[in-house]
Protein backbone atom coordinates (compact mmCIF):
# COMPACT_ATOMS: atom_id res chain seq x y z
CA UNK A 1 0.00 0.00 0.00
CA UNK A 2 1.19 3.52 -0.76
CA UNK A 3 -0.03 6.99 0.16
CA UNK A 4 0.74 10.23 -1.66
CA UNK A 5 0.83 13.82 -0.51
CA UNK A 6 0.84 17.05 -2.50
CA UNK A 7 -0.23 16.83 -6.16
CA UNK A 8 3.04 18.24 -7.54
CA UNK A 9 5.13 15.45 -9.06
CA UNK A 10 8.52 16.85 -8.05
CA UNK A 11 9.91 18.76 -5.08
CA UNK A 12 9.01 22.44 -5.21
CA UNK A 13 11.54 24.45 -7.14
CA UNK A 14 12.11 27.38 -4.78
CA UNK A 15 13.41 25.27 -1.88
CA UNK A 16 15.73 23.19 -4.03
CA UNK A 17 16.89 26.01 -6.31
CA UNK A 18 17.86 28.13 -3.31
CA UNK A 19 19.61 25.15 -1.72
CA UNK A 20 21.65 24.17 -4.78
CA UNK A 21 22.37 27.77 -5.73
CA UNK A 22 24.13 28.26 -2.38
CA UNK A 23 25.30 24.71 -1.85
CA UNK A 24 29.05 25.27 -2.07
CA UNK A 25 29.14 28.50 -0.06
CA UNK A 26 31.04 28.41 3.21
CA UNK A 27 27.81 29.08 5.13
CA UNK A 28 26.06 25.95 3.89
CA UNK A 29 29.23 23.86 4.03
CA UNK A 30 29.69 24.93 7.64
CA UNK A 31 26.12 23.96 8.47
CA UNK A 32 26.75 20.49 7.01
CA UNK A 33 29.95 20.15 9.05
CA UNK A 34 28.11 21.14 12.22
CA UNK A 35 25.22 18.79 11.45
CA UNK A 36 27.12 15.71 10.27
CA UNK A 37 30.62 16.06 11.69
CA UNK A 38 32.08 16.40 8.20
CA UNK A 39 30.90 17.77 4.89
CA UNK A 40 30.51 15.24 2.07
CA UNK A 41 28.00 17.41 0.24
CA UNK A 42 24.98 15.50 1.51
CA UNK A 43 21.49 16.94 1.18
CA UNK A 44 19.43 14.45 3.18
CA UNK A 45 20.07 12.23 6.16
CA UNK A 46 23.22 10.47 4.90
CA UNK A 47 26.40 10.42 7.00
CA UNK A 48 29.89 9.45 5.82
CA UNK A 49 29.92 6.36 8.05
CA UNK A 50 26.56 5.28 6.69
CA UNK A 51 27.72 5.70 3.09
CA UNK A 52 30.83 3.61 3.81
CA UNK A 53 28.63 0.80 5.10
CA UNK A 54 26.40 1.01 2.04
CA UNK A 55 29.44 0.80 -0.24
CA UNK A 56 30.43 -2.51 1.32
CA UNK A 57 27.24 -4.00 -0.17
CA UNK A 58 27.83 -2.79 -3.74
CA UNK A 59 31.12 -4.44 -4.81
CA UNK A 60 32.33 -1.33 -6.63
CA UNK A 61 35.89 -1.11 -7.97
CA UNK A 62 37.81 0.33 -10.94
CA UNK A 63 36.20 -0.71 -14.21
CA UNK A 64 32.68 -0.75 -12.80
CA UNK A 65 30.04 1.90 -13.45
CA UNK A 66 27.57 3.40 -10.98
CA UNK A 67 24.37 5.34 -11.65
CA UNK A 68 23.46 7.65 -8.75
CA UNK A 69 19.81 8.71 -9.06
CA UNK A 70 18.84 12.10 -7.60
CA UNK A 71 22.49 12.92 -7.01
CA UNK A 72 21.86 16.49 -5.92
CA UNK A 73 24.99 18.64 -5.89
CA UNK A 74 27.15 15.56 -6.36
CA UNK A 75 29.24 15.39 -3.19
CA UNK A 76 28.32 11.85 -2.10
CA UNK A 77 28.54 10.64 -5.72
CA UNK A 78 32.07 11.97 -6.10
CA UNK A 79 33.06 10.50 -2.75
CA UNK A 80 32.05 7.06 -4.07
CA UNK A 81 34.18 7.58 -7.18
CA UNK A 82 37.16 8.67 -5.08
CA UNK A 83 36.89 5.79 -2.59
CA UNK A 84 36.19 2.94 -5.04
CA UNK A 85 37.76 4.02 -8.32
CA UNK A 86 34.58 3.25 -10.24
CA UNK A 87 33.16 5.58 -12.87
CA UNK A 88 29.99 7.40 -11.84
CA UNK A 89 27.07 9.03 -13.60
CA UNK A 90 24.88 11.23 -11.43
CA UNK A 91 21.45 12.33 -12.58
CA UNK A 92 19.04 14.84 -11.09
CA UNK A 93 15.91 16.64 -12.27
CA UNK A 94 17.26 20.02 -11.14
CA UNK A 95 19.62 21.79 -13.54
CA UNK A 96 21.06 23.85 -10.67
CA UNK A 97 22.05 20.63 -8.88
CA UNK A 98 23.80 19.29 -11.98
CA UNK A 99 25.63 22.60 -12.48
CA UNK A 100 26.88 22.44 -8.89
CA UNK A 101 27.90 18.78 -9.26
CA UNK A 102 29.74 19.39 -12.53
CA UNK A 103 31.64 22.28 -11.00
CA UNK A 104 32.62 20.17 -7.99
CA UNK A 105 33.79 17.28 -10.21
CA UNK A 106 36.03 19.68 -12.15
CA UNK A 107 37.46 21.09 -8.92
CA UNK A 108 38.25 17.60 -7.65
CA UNK A 109 39.70 16.47 -10.99
CA UNK A 110 37.66 13.28 -11.20
CA UNK A 111 37.69 12.39 -14.89
CA UNK A 112 35.46 9.34 -14.40
CA UNK A 113 32.55 11.38 -13.06
CA UNK A 114 29.71 12.65 -15.22
CA UNK A 115 26.48 14.44 -14.37
CA UNK A 116 23.39 15.14 -16.43
CA UNK A 117 19.84 16.38 -16.04
CA UNK A 118 17.31 13.54 -16.16
CA UNK A 119 13.89 12.92 -14.63
CA UNK A 120 13.97 9.60 -12.78
CA UNK A 121 10.17 9.56 -12.63
CA UNK A 122 10.23 8.65 -16.34
CA UNK A 123 12.10 6.19 -18.55
CA UNK A 124 15.80 7.02 -18.47
CA UNK A 125 17.81 7.65 -21.67
CA UNK A 126 20.32 4.82 -21.20
CA UNK A 127 20.65 1.42 -22.91
CA UNK A 128 19.75 -1.84 -21.20
CA UNK A 129 22.34 -3.47 -18.89
CA UNK A 130 24.52 -0.35 -18.66
CA UNK A 131 25.38 -0.15 -14.95
CA UNK A 132 27.02 -2.42 -12.39
CA UNK A 133 25.25 -0.64 -9.54
CA UNK A 134 22.51 1.91 -8.97
CA UNK A 135 21.99 4.01 -5.85
CA UNK A 136 19.25 6.42 -4.80
CA UNK A 137 19.60 7.95 -1.34
CA UNK A 138 16.60 9.55 0.38
CA UNK A 139 14.89 10.47 -2.89
CA UNK A 140 12.83 7.52 -4.14
CA UNK A 141 9.96 8.90 -2.05
CA UNK A 142 9.74 11.84 -4.48
CA UNK A 143 9.02 9.54 -7.46
CA UNK A 144 5.33 8.74 -7.98
CA UNK A 145 5.37 5.19 -9.41
CA UNK A 146 7.50 2.78 -7.37
CA UNK A 147 6.98 -0.15 -9.73
CA UNK A 148 7.89 1.87 -12.82
CA UNK A 149 11.02 3.21 -11.13
CA UNK A 150 12.26 -0.18 -9.92
CA UNK A 151 11.45 -1.81 -13.27
CA UNK A 152 13.49 0.86 -15.03
CA UNK A 153 16.43 0.39 -12.68
CA UNK A 154 16.24 -3.37 -13.20
CA UNK A 155 16.45 -2.80 -16.96
CA UNK A 156 19.57 -0.68 -16.56
CA UNK A 157 21.41 -3.09 -14.26
CA UNK A 158 23.84 -5.62 -15.66
CA UNK A 159 23.36 -9.27 -14.63
CA UNK A 160 24.54 -9.62 -11.01
CA UNK A 161 24.38 -5.82 -10.72
CA UNK A 162 23.31 -4.35 -7.41
CA UNK A 163 20.75 -1.76 -6.39
CA UNK A 164 20.72 0.19 -3.14
CA UNK A 165 18.16 2.78 -2.09
CA UNK A 166 16.85 4.33 1.09
CA UNK A 167 13.17 5.05 1.68
CA UNK A 168 12.78 7.67 4.43
CA UNK A 169 8.96 7.75 4.44
CA UNK A 170 7.79 4.29 5.48
CA UNK A 171 4.66 4.60 7.61
CA UNK A 172 5.18 2.68 10.85
CA UNK A 173 2.67 4.40 13.11
CA UNK A 174 -0.34 6.71 13.16
CA UNK A 175 0.05 10.11 11.50
CA UNK A 176 -2.22 13.14 11.50
CA UNK A 177 -3.02 15.21 8.43
CA UNK A 178 -1.15 18.15 9.95
CA UNK A 179 1.94 16.04 10.65
CA UNK A 180 1.99 14.74 7.09
CA UNK A 181 1.58 18.26 5.68
CA UNK A 182 4.55 19.58 7.67
CA UNK A 183 6.74 16.55 6.90
CA UNK A 184 5.97 16.70 3.15
CA UNK A 185 5.90 20.45 2.56
CA UNK A 186 8.63 20.43 -0.11
CA UNK A 187 6.64 18.82 -2.93
CA UNK A 188 5.46 15.37 -3.94
CA UNK A 189 5.99 12.48 -1.50
CA UNK A 190 5.08 8.82 -1.81
CA UNK A 191 4.56 7.26 1.62
CA UNK A 192 4.81 3.47 1.74
CA UNK A 193 3.93 0.77 4.24
CA UNK A 194 6.24 -1.98 5.57
CA UNK A 195 6.70 -4.76 3.02
CA UNK A 196 5.77 -2.67 -0.02
CA UNK A 197 9.33 -2.13 -1.27
CA UNK A 198 10.26 -5.79 -0.80
CA UNK A 199 7.19 -6.86 -2.74
CA UNK A 200 7.88 -4.54 -5.68
CA UNK A 201 11.53 -5.59 -5.78
CA UNK A 202 10.41 -9.20 -6.00
CA UNK A 203 7.87 -8.41 -8.73
CA UNK A 204 10.64 -6.72 -10.74
CA UNK A 205 12.79 -9.85 -10.57
CA UNK A 206 15.33 -8.56 -8.07
CA UNK A 207 16.61 -10.56 -5.12
CA UNK A 208 16.62 -8.64 -1.85
CA UNK A 209 19.98 -8.92 -0.09
CA UNK A 210 19.47 -6.60 2.86
CA UNK A 211 16.66 -4.66 4.49
CA UNK A 212 17.58 -2.59 7.51
CA UNK A 213 15.79 -0.07 9.70
CA UNK A 214 18.00 3.03 9.82
CA UNK A 215 15.44 5.42 11.31
CA UNK A 216 17.80 6.38 14.13
CA UNK A 217 20.11 8.10 11.63
CA UNK A 218 17.26 10.24 10.35
CA UNK A 219 16.20 11.20 13.88
CA UNK A 220 19.74 12.23 14.80
CA UNK A 221 20.47 14.03 11.52
CA UNK A 222 17.22 16.00 11.65
CA UNK A 223 17.95 17.28 15.15
CA UNK A 224 21.53 18.23 14.27
CA UNK A 225 20.55 19.94 11.01
CA UNK A 226 17.85 21.97 12.75
CA UNK A 227 20.28 23.11 15.45
CA UNK A 228 23.03 23.91 12.94
CA UNK A 229 20.65 26.02 10.87
CA UNK A 230 19.29 27.79 13.96
CA UNK A 231 22.83 28.90 14.81
CA UNK A 232 22.86 30.82 11.49
CA UNK A 233 19.25 31.97 11.57
CA UNK A 234 19.90 35.58 10.58
CA UNK A 235 21.97 34.71 7.51
CA UNK A 236 19.57 31.98 6.40
CA UNK A 237 16.51 34.20 6.73
CA UNK A 238 18.24 36.74 4.47
CA UNK A 239 19.09 34.11 1.84
CA UNK A 240 16.01 31.91 1.99
CA UNK A 241 13.33 34.31 3.20
CA UNK A 242 11.42 34.12 6.47
CA UNK A 243 8.69 31.70 5.45
CA UNK A 244 10.97 29.20 3.64
CA UNK A 245 13.41 29.25 6.56
CA UNK A 246 10.63 28.56 9.05
CA UNK A 247 9.10 25.86 6.84
CA UNK A 248 12.44 24.05 6.66
CA UNK A 249 12.95 24.29 10.42
CA UNK A 250 9.43 22.97 11.04
CA UNK A 251 10.10 20.17 8.56
CA UNK A 252 13.28 19.14 10.37
CA UNK A 253 11.55 19.26 13.75
CA UNK A 254 8.71 17.09 12.46
CA UNK A 255 11.01 14.65 10.66
CA UNK A 256 13.03 14.21 13.83
CA UNK A 257 10.01 13.74 16.07
CA UNK A 258 8.25 11.24 13.80
CA UNK A 259 11.49 9.29 13.43
CA UNK A 260 12.22 9.37 17.16
CA UNK A 261 8.72 8.05 17.85
CA UNK A 262 9.08 5.45 15.06
CA UNK A 263 5.95 6.64 13.27
CA UNK A 264 7.60 7.57 9.95
CA UNK A 265 10.69 5.46 9.41
CA UNK A 266 13.72 5.17 7.14
CA UNK A 267 14.85 1.86 5.66
CA UNK A 268 17.70 0.86 3.37
CA UNK A 269 17.23 -1.85 0.74
CA UNK A 270 19.96 -3.66 -1.18
CA UNK A 271 19.04 -6.02 -4.00
CA UNK A 272 20.70 -7.93 -6.82
CA UNK A 273 19.71 -8.67 -10.39
CA UNK A 274 20.06 -12.39 -11.20
CA UNK A 275 23.11 -13.35 -13.27
CA UNK A 276 23.00 -14.91 -16.71
What are these regions (language model features)?
Residues 210-276:
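Conserved Class I S-adenosyl-L-methionine
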Residues 122-133:
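A short acidic, Gly/Pro-enriched loop at the edge of an enzyme's catalytic core
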Residues 1-35:
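N-terminal, positively charged/glycine-rich alpha-helical extensions of SAM-dependent methyltransferases
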Residues 168-188:
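Short, glycine-/aromatic-enriched active-site segment of Class I SAM-dependent methyltransferases
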Residues 147-162:
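A short glycine-rich, Lys/Arg-flanked "PGG" loop and its adjoining helix->strand segment in the class I
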Residues 189-205:
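Short alpha-helix
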Residues 44-62:
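Conserved alpha-helix/loop element of class I SAM-dependent methyltransferases that forms part
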Residues 65-69, 73-122:
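Class I SAM-dependent methyltransferase SAM/SAH-binding core
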Amino acid sequence: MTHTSNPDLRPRGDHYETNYGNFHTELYAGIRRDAFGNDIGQNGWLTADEQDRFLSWLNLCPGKRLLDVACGAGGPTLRIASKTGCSVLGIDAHASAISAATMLAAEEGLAGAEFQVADAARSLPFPDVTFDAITCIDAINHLPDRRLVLSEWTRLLKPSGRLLFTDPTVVTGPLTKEEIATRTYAGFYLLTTPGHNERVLRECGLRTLTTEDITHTMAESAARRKAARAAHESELRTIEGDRPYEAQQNFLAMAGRLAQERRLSRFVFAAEKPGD
